[in-house]
Amino acid sequence: MTTRVGINGFGRIGRNFFRAALEQGADIEVVAVNDLTDNKTLAHLLKYDSITGRFQGEVSYDDEGIIVDGKHIKVLAPRNPADLPWGDLGVEVVVESTGFFTDGEKAKAHLEGGAKKVVISAPAKNVDGTFVMGVNEADYDNATMNIVSNASCTTNCLAPLAKVLEENFGIERGIMTTIHSYTGDQRVLDAPHSDLRRARAAALNMIPTKTGAAQAVALVLPALEGKFDGLAVRVPTPTGSLTDLTFIAKNEVSVEAVKAAVKAAAEGELKGVLKYTEDPIVSTDIVGDPHTSIFDATETKVIGNLVKVLSWYDNEWGYSNALVRLTALIGSKLA
């Protein structure tokens, strides 16, 4: 049965989620969008995208919403999620992608509005579970979990790879760096920001900053609790990021063994999530790739039991595809 979905926040992730759901042919119907932006602008930004290109379909708008390939999608504009008529619209699952309701205590307002489930498209606190597809989605329990998080784009890249490495070689401890494209949280030109590094011009600087992705891996892989730390370096690209993980394995390993383990997982249990490549790729080559983790095999380095691996990810498109898969999974469990 098709899951009826509402999107709260039709920004970068909200629009990419919408596109990805159509491209995947997911058993999802987006029936409503809540956003404070006017319908004309929402339709325009869906139709034309500087990264993903022009929408391959017909997009228009009217006073009540946007129209995509002849299907009308209602646009709402309440600021408080509790005021949204999700129940009246038959919305079953809400994708919370505003970035403002990353606390389950606030996101539960969607349930008060009549939705059955909420999926937060960001790391979140006070939720019933955090999930990374390919890693721990089997732990989802429809009976007890109403508000869940899809983690972050970086955690979605790191966790599948860490799962393979932990299961095959054991991880004593590790440090990761995400070389991450700039995001809307940064400043286009130097301007005030609570993070003084993010206050600097995003397209002109490499910007060291924080990430919670390393610690968040333990939310989906409890065996790695307390074993990871990390940081981010924001770089002047609009999308396409790279996770650099250095870890100490429990025993000595070889480059060949690491590559073989990841390749086997990418062709087996993690197919569609983890991708293996030996091509000499650069960041633009993975833009538009739906995998959440693209292992760059030829950059694997080993000294004894000290290992360095690299994995690429399209921090918008790859993440949005994972968000679609998690939403579809949750919808499939509804009675």
Residue ranges of model-derived segments:
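Acidic, glycine-rich segments within the central catalytic cores of soluble metabolic enzymes
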Residues: 167-238
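N-terminal Rossmann-like NAD(P) cofactor-binding subdomain of oxidoreductases
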Residues: 1-199, 301, 325, 332-334
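Short clusters of hydrophobic/aromatic residues that line enzyme substrate/ligand-binding pockets
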Residues: 66, 131-133, 147, 189, ...
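Hydrophobic alpha-helical scaffolding
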Residues: 151-152, 206-208, 248, 313
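Predominant activation on well-ordered alpha-helical scaffold segments within soluble catalytic domains
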Residues: 18, 108, 159-166, 177, ...
